[in-house]
């Protein structure tokens, strides 16, 4: 990808989800992954097992305070969007990519905190047609990242 695209993983529980997100990030050309909160890093063997080496091709950085990171990126003129179902979220199919761009994804159960959501430029969701309320964080991240490539 020729444009700067960043990914912020906040409080993701599963090392396997993190590893799979690294593989997807490599596939779409993510410039850097910021790993926030208690999200496992590639130093965790489960992350490395699932990422199949993508942790070596995608730059990453551990960053404990995600809301401060959002503010820091925005101060550098990087648009920051969240992938989260909320009362203010919009259908991801309407998303128009503008770079540089950072995408924040959160915990598999709790999602993103209001402290983060109030700081992002916009919030987007993937509509669900079945009985389940959401997709797995890795799947949702992949869907949204490929939308960004359009």
Predicted segments with their positions:
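Active-site/ligand-binding-proximal alpha/beta "capping" segment
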Residues: 85-127
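RNA substrate-binding interface of SAM-dependent RNA methyltransferases
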Residues: 1-86
